[in-house]
Curated annotation (Swiss-Prot):
Matches recorded under PANTHER family: NADH DEHYDROGENASE, NADH DEHYDROGENASE [UBIQUINONE] IRON-SULFUR PROTEIN 7, MITOCHONDRIAL
Required co-factors: [4Fe-4S] cluster
Name of the gene: nuoB2
Leader sequence residues: none
Protein name from the UniProt record: NADH-quinone oxidoreductase subunit B 2
Membrane topology: Peripheral membrane protein
Subunit structure: NDH-1 is composed of 14 different subunits. Subunits NuoB, C, D, E, F, and G constitute the peripheral sector of the complex.
HAMAP family the UniProt entry points to: NDH1_NuoB
């Protein structure tokens, strides 16, 4: 016997945060960003056999302003990285990134100067999906896990304050799993640099600055070259 028994029929009780997050996770719209062979598996997942419309994402959006999920399907070249960042910046808030396949996540077998060694050097990644290429079932599983993450995200300024309070108490890590670029994880000094940037709220600035410093041909345009 709860309060629901005393209310008129047709009344549903919930918190605004849970309701908004439920609506967000139930209508995740993906942006078309296929780069290599992983895109073929992404196309297969979007077909009628797997019926992704069950989760409200049966259509991939051609405009980033109408999308809130970027699935990076394939390796990212150095020339494609600025385009990827521009599309990410044009996406609606809140937005999420799923790195599909080992090439997008760490460069994979393309360990050379032409390929970005992990898309997390360019944009923040919310979910990593291994495989070369991962099957459509694996992509759907990663999307379902991302939906659960969306469901528990804080909402609004009060929610962010609560999340910061939890971080201060040590209830959750200062740097959420998956947000730190892969090249920072093996170096203690760089990990400390990233953690400090997260505390100061400038991790995106640090991510872009480090990527630009690694591109000598772009430094002259950004005024970074001394």
């Amino acid at each position: 016997m709860g309060i629901e028994e005393k209310l008129p029929a047709g009344v549903l009780l919930t918190s605004v945060e849970k309701f908004v997050n439920w609506s967000r996770k139930s209508s995740v719209w993906g942006a078309t960003f296929g780069l290599a062979c992983c895109a073929i598996e992404m196309m297969a997942a979007g077909g009628p056999h797997y019926d992704m419309g069950r989760w409200g994402m049966e259509v991939f959006r051609a405009s980033p302003r109408q999308a809130d999920l970027m699935i990076v399907a394939g390796r990212v070249s150095q020339k494609m990285a600025p385009v990827l960042r521009q599309i990410y910046d044009q996406m609606a808030e809140p937005r999420w990134v799923l790195s599909m396949g080992v090439c997008a996540s760490s460069g994979g077998m393309f360990n050379n100067y032409a390929i970005v060694q992990g898309v997390d050097h360019v944009v923040p990644v919310d979910m990593y999906l291994p495989g070369c290429p991962p099957r459509p079932e694996m992509l759907i599983d990663a999307i379902l896990k991302l939906r659960e993450k969306i469901m528990h995200e804080p909402l609004g300024p009060n929610g962010r304050k609560m999340a910061e309070a939890r971080k201060a108490r040590g209830d959750v890590p200062v740097v959420p799993y998956g947000s730190m670029p892969s090249s920072y994880r093996s170096d203690k000094a760089r990990r400390a640099e990233w953690t400090k940037a997260v505390r100061e709220g400038r991790e995106e600035q640090l991510r872009i600055e480090n990527w630009m410093k690694a591109q000598p041909h772009l430094q002259q345009y950004e005024g970074l070259k001394k």
